[in-house]
């Protein structure tokens, strides 16, 4: 309930929900890589959303195709879009809320937490490698791997860490 399979033209990849909190207000977004949305500020994307069944997700999915505005990081292959307008549209069209679980800053590792980790840690990637997914139930594929650089150190001053994992096209944007 945290990821979406994004399709932008002939390109596809993964996006994940992230809730920005500003002045006690939550702003839900989808974060992905720029190249997933073809490096275009405005892009038509398609994805399926789980609809709400009270306080949990239902087995009902809803396909959305929208033209959306992406906000790009100035130097990283990273972007986000505000998703609340999509949630409002889905509510208007179906009478149901979208069920999602958004990440937030609480999942980000503090310097102290990162320094306590070993250089070799098991990691999990959630996404849609080579287009694989459980289309009927709208669920992603889970992959496991390991850190290939120490999580506390900025690999080559690039602002990233390195993992050793079987990653395929479509995994881009995975959390």
Roles of regions detected by a PLM:
Residues 1-12, 38-169, 173:
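Serine endopeptidase catalytic core focused on the charge-relay Asp
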Residues 3-29:
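A conserved glycine-rich beta-strand in the N-terminal activation segment of trypsin-fold
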Residues 32:
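Cytochrome P450 catalytic-core helices
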Residues 35:
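Histidine-centered active-site/metal-ligand motif
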């Amino acid at each position: 309930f945290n990821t979406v399979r994004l399709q932008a033209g002939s390109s596809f990849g993964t996006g994940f929900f992230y809730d920005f909190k500003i002045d006690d207000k939550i702003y839900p977004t989808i974060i992905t890589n720029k190249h997933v949305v073809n490096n275009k500020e405005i892009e038509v994307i398609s994805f399926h959303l789980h609809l709400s069944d009270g306080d949990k997700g239902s087995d009902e999915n809803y396909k959305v195709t929208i033209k959306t505005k992406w906000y790009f990081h100035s130097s990283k292959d990273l972007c986000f879009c505000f998703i609340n307008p999509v949630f409002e549209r889905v509510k208007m069209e179906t009478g149901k809320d979208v069920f999602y679980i958004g990440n937030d800053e609480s999942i980000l590792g503090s310097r102290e937490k990162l320094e306590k980790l070993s250089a070799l840690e098991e990691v999990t990637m959630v996404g849609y490698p080579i287009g694989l997914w459980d289309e009927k139930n709208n669920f992603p594929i889970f992959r496991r791997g390991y850190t290939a650089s120490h999580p506390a150190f900025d690999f080559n001053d690039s602002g990233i860490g390195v993992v050793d994992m079987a990653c395929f096209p479509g995994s881009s944007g995975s959390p």
